[in-house]
């Protein structure tokens, strides 16, 4: 069954939380009004007022924003009824610390934090497996796009000898 159909067949929406409310999360928020079965429970950010402005600038109305729990601390929201945490700080140290706390609390985590993934991804995957939860990369972040390209190449019969992102090496 396709993912959208599975989502639509749920009785209750998936409750999510964001850690970090910058560019990536703002892009998600811009689509949020069109997502029926996803509910933002919480947003953790060091600058709550800026996070609220990002929500507003992304098209969320004041009623929707008022229903979101904003916090400066992940610890304050770990016991809430949240199914999936999206770690989007872009900081490898904080991202890893956040992911470990989430995983050890038996919650799923999506990393929009390539920095944490490249430094500690294997470790996070191992402890997620031990705790019976999923630690995944976000579609659209560099590692998941590279994996998609590798899978496409292999499905089309190509042998992949190297894969990566070289855009930052090109001077335009």
Range-by-range predicted roles:
Residues 108-110:
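A short hydrophobic/small-residue beta-strand
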């Amino acid at each position: 069954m396709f993912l959208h159909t599975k989502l639509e067949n749920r009785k209750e929406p998936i409750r999510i939380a964001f850690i970090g409310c910058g560019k990536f999360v703002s892009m998600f928020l811009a689509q949020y009004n069109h997502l029926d079965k996803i509910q933002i429970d919480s947003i953790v950010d060091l600058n709550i007022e800026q996070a609220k402005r990002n929500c507003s600038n992304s098209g969320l109305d004041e009623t929707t924003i008022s229903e979101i729990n904003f916090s400066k601390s992940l610890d304050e929201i770990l016991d809430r009824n949240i199914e999936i945490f999206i770690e989007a700080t872009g900081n490898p140290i904080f991202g890893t610390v956040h992911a470990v706390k989430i995983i050890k609390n038996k919650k799923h985590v999506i990393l929009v934090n390539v920095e944490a993934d490249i430094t500690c991804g294997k470790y996070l995957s191992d402890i997620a497996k031990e705790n019976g939860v999923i630690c995944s990369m976000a579609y659209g972040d560099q590692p998941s796009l590279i994996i998609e390209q590798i899978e496409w190449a292999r499905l089309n019969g190509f042998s992949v000898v190297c894969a990566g992102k070289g855009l930052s090496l090109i001077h335009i």
